[in-house]
């Protein structure tokens, strides 16, 4: 008897000697069955809500393990799958993300990261990000929504901001919570503020940097901006010294006393550090004075009348055609005068040409004319200059070859030369002897 598919998930049947006994599920199999059902129905997840603060770095990791269970065939408990998964993120209803939000995923086998610094304009407005995961092996997709609820910060923006350039880090490495925490701890030891936040992280490639060579584990570099509520420390101010500025202009490393606190993990380019004091910046914002929204009275509007006066275009038509025609006629007359009235003539040319040159030219023309006439009519007798006069052996005078009833036009050239009636074949004498090479 064939059992239902759902019953095969249970414990194998326990048969008694009398026949079929009671069938049941073991606790382990029951847990497996419930886990499978939960995995199948967990494809429909609820939207995830996050609450970042404006002006503070926001980091959200898209974990591959979170999406692996949503691609069929669903993995069994304890089974590990390593399918390549990529992510596509966009603002709901739009093809791309908001301007302040960035996304990076180095390889399909690594997690994706959403990061950025929320702006104050989006405070109180939920930002819905659609996250679509693609399984590159099975071509299955899964979609979730990330709702970003931006909260207002207490002291936004922080008045003192410093931007560091770290040469031995990539963006995805710096976004790790442990690495970012270690960097903020080192900055806090140097700066010693009461409040310190990471404001933004930017890759050096986004600032015009070059892609590093794949040798010696070279990194792209990353810019990290932090903000604090106290003025800059004396160590950070050392970058502004004239001696250090001179060394930076000569592409030499400046001498910073607190560099050893970062050197153990972070290689900072102190020549690219930027210190911004918001308290000394003069605000250029001008308050907009709003009016009443009423346009000044310009009188009653008077549209043009419907009955327009007729306009005569005859004069314009004549001017348009007459002027180009007159110019063309003048040019034609000038060209005709040059070509017809300014010619020297044949008589004048012959008078200025020497007689011997004219005779030579006339002979050439006569010969050319005779050859053309001969090519047109081949039935006439050959020129006497081309016929043999004396016999090559006897010396007798040979009568004319062509008679009136002789068709020379149908005779091949070789035949006329070989089968002449008064022509004697002259045997060729062959010389005997040895050939020497």
Swiss-Prot record:
UniProt-annotated glycosylation sites, renumbered to this chain: 200
Topological domain ranges for the Extracellular compartment: 1-317
Compartments in which it is found: Cell membrane, Sarcolemma; Cytoplasm, Cytoskeleton; Cell projection, Dendrite; Golgi apparatus
Mode of membrane association: Single-pass membrane protein
Keyword rRNA-binding found: no
GO cellular component: cytoskeleton; dendrite membrane; Golgi apparatus; plasma membrane; sarcoglycan complex; sarcolemma
Cytoplasmic topology ranges: 339-437
Domain of life: Eukaryota
Post-translational modification: N-glycosylated. Ubiquitinated, leading to its degradation by the proteasome.
UniProt keywords, alphabetically: Cell membrane, Cell projection, Cytoplasm, Cytoskeleton, Glycoprotein, Golgi apparatus, Membrane, Transmembrane, Transmembrane helix, Ubl conjugation
Disordered: annotated span: 418-437
Positions of transmembrane segments: 318-338
InterPro entries: Cadg, Sarcoglycan_alpha/epsilon, Sarcoglycan_C, Sarcoglycan_N
General function of this protein: Component of the sarcoglycan complex, a subcomplex of the dystrophin-glycoprotein complex which forms a link between the F-actin cytoskeleton and the extracellular matrix.
UniProt record similarity statement: Belongs to the sarcoglycan alpha/epsilon family.
Protein known as: Epsilon-sarcoglycan
Originating species: Bos taurus
